[in-house]
């Protein structure tokens, strides 16, 4: 990673931790909910988010929702996080294979991408069922890199109430995980949704996260041109254009459903519900 980017993305771990923990507390109070439910996958994003949630409130519940495509190491690391958070009485293990098989059989598909999205959406349904039972919010685990790239399932892992690490790039999440004292194996593990066997984020995207984060930061935080990024990072312009395109074509994933404006007070375009009523 270019030294300028490394310095720019370096975070004050204590300050970031304190800020996010306080914001979680505030948002739970504002939402009039008792706590948060979270899915833990064994990856760094869910591990960091679960740790921050546990620091914010004692009222948290963890769901482990493996499938046949979940690597054993991910399930092992999920249980490692249960121990790390002393949450032996605050979790539930639910294998989703039978539910996913029922869905895929009904729609008569063996397409791995469709089935992968079904898996993500089944997990969302389970999270919200537990959230309703417990009167909790669903706490999402997406980071800024994934959100910008659209590397999540709409109404799947993207279907949540709050995204505590949504303004941290993947490399920053790893920094924070290290500062929080998470197991090294989890902090450094290659990211993967594990929606099918052998899937890795970097393999699917074709670019490593250090390069992705460098491009995203320069392009969308500093508003640099493609040519400037190519010159600074010394990478082919095709890679910069690919990242740029992924952000543009996934914009619909980051927005609420489009409402076609007919009146002078259309929701979202003319009238927005305030975060807090005065």
Swiss-Prot record:
GO cellular component entries: cytoplasm
Per UniProt, where does Mg(2+) bind?
A: 45, 146
Give the reaction(s) catalysed. Answer: deamido-NAD(+) + NH4(+) + ATP = AMP + diphosphate + NAD(+) + H(+)
**GO function terms (MF aspect):** ATP binding; glutaminase activity; metal ion binding; NAD+ synthase (glutamine-hydrolyzing) activity; NAD+ synthase activity
The residues the record assigns to binding deamido-NAD(+) are: 121, 154, 161, 252-253
Alphabetical keyword list: ATP-binding, Ligase, Magnesium, Metal-binding, NAD, Nucleotide-binding
Q: Which residues bind ATP?
A: 39-46, 141, 170, 192
Q: How does it assemble?
A: Homodimer.
Family assignment from sequence similarity: Belongs to the NAD synthetase family.
Q: What is this protein called?
A: NH(3)-dependent NAD(+) synthetase
Q: Which organism is it from?
A: Saccharolobus solfataricus (strain ATCC 35092 / DSM 1617 / JCM 11322 / P2) (Sulfolobus solfataricus)
Give the lineage.
Archaea, Thermoproteota, Thermoprotei, Sulfolobales, Sulfolobaceae
